[in-house]
């Protein structure tokens, strides 16, 4: 699989993405290539670490902790909050707590590093994205519709209720990508877990079962994470200046 052709194709696609972003979207021509290089370096380093880490449960736990910290920091930055972005760790934690204990207690996912780390990573990544988008769009909405919040407050409504009226739609929108992925799985898209298991085992039934597990786990974790984000924003724990 690893060949000169693969390297050439990846380089061409990364450069092409940068050119399109620069010429047509007026963005940075280096954003996509730099992101691609960073992904190569990070995945190479992670692959090397995982070979050793997944062999022991305690080292797998360290990997999971690092993944969670990075996800929380990334979500905080993406939210563009000026205060309280650290609270997004609570949203991620709630999302993971709703899924991982259930998977482990029922034996669906074996209590081993080689099984737990991939599932944890997929669910955490999706929850991070949904929570960050939810926080960012909710704060955007509070900024753009500040007058509506003030009007609701003037009528005697609570601060939480006044903000929640404005941010409900943005919170729901943050869930759309994964909902669409679940709705179109197998019809429009062949998700990564499905393809990976199919290539590894050749069993379509096993591949389908793993992908269903991942998709539904993502749905639950993201819904819980976004719900917590909504409460945190509505209660003023996560804010943006002038928001």
Task: Give each language-model segment a name.
Residues 30-58, 62-65:
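Loop-to-helix transition at the N-terminal end of transmembrane alpha-helices
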Residues 66-75, 120-128, 217-219:
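Alpha-helical transmembrane segments and their membrane-interface exit regions
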Residues 124-149, 228:
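Membrane-embedded alpha-helices of multi-pass transport/permease systems
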Residues 171-243:
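Transmembrane alpha-helix interface motif
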């Amino acid at each position: 699989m690893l060949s000169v052709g693969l390297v050439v194709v990846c380089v061409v696609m990364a450069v092409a993405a940068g050119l399109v972003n620069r010429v047509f979207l007026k963005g940075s021509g280096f954003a996509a290539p730099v992101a691609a290089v960073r992904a190569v370096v990070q995945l190479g380093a992670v692959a090397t670490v995982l070979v050793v880490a997944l062999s022991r449960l305690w080292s797998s736990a360290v990997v999971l902790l690092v993944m969670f910290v990075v996800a929380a920091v990334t979500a905080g930055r993406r939210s563009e909050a000026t205060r309280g972005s650290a609270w997004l760790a609570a949203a991620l934690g709630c999302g993971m707590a709703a899924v991982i204990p259930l998977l482990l207690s029922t034996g669906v996912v074996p209590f081993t590093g080689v099984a737990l780390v991939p599932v944890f990573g997929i669910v955490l990544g999706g929850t991070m994205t949904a929570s960050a988008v939810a926080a960012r769009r909710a704060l955007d909405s509070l900024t753009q519709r500040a007058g509506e919040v003030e009007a609701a407050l003037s009528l005697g409504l609570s601060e939480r209720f006044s903000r929640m009226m404005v941010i409900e739609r943005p919170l729901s929108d943050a869930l759309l990508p994964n909902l669409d992925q679940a709705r179109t799985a197998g019809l429009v898209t062949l998700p990564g877990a499905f393809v990976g298991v199919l290539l590894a085992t050749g069993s379509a039934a096993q591949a389908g079962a793993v992908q269903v597990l991942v998709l539904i786990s993502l749905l639950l974790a993201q819904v819980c994470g976004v719900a917590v984000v909504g409460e945190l924003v509505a209660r003023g724990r996560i804010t943006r200046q002038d928001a």
